[in-house]
């Protein structure tokens, strides 16, 4: 919250989306917003199978949206669904395709939930990982923003079939 007390940083607030992965964190951001008397844009993290954090399912996401409505200085700006696990799933027995469909189904359900709760999904950031899966997003995706950066330098752990058209940016001996 020290960073937010700086006047120059406060001017950047309308462009920043704060990633929230739990109800406790949502309450903490509400307290910060209240103390500063500033609106904070909140992007909720949905666990779509990686299990590294975020709201575990659509019901938990609804709980967060219900709670956010109680805080006038919190503005829901979107959703983040990190799906880095998908590209590393084996293709055997359609495991990768099934994981991808689960991600897409959860994104679809989240967009429907946003609509039911009075939000316009087309105005929200619906972000997904993208670095290892952007070619899959090009085929089918409910996300409207993906993060690709690391794919273009092709670190060795990104040597995956979904990125086979890339070559490493450099080799360090």
PLM feature segments, named:
Residues 1, 14-24:
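Catalytic beta/alpha-barrel core
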Residues 165-173:
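Short, intrinsically disordered, charge-balanced linker/junction segments flanking boundaries
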Residues 41, 47-163:
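Active-site loop/helix belt of alpha/beta enzymes
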Residues 14-18, 38-42, 124:
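Generic beta-strand structural signal
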